[in-house]
Amino acid sequence: MAEVLITFKIMPAEVDVNIDSIQDAIKKIKTARLSKIEKEPIAFGLVALKPSFIANDEGGAADEIEKELKKIEGIGSAEVIEVTRLL
């Protein structure tokens, strides 16, 4: 079965949230394989995280990962920004 690379944009709930603790929690997600996490400065000290996961190309993979992300304390929002099929 083919695999897809799913990239999310995660915004913290507040400016003073510890981004490193969110990053550590993301690394513990077992729903899919974590490929990388990038930090994206937004404004006024606010930093978004852009984790990319590798998952099987079956319906609902992105939704399952998103559910896991939203359970993490300190995350204000999590949305899919890119899905790419891997060869």
Per-region residue spans from a language model:
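Long, contiguous binding/interaction regions
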Residues: 1-87
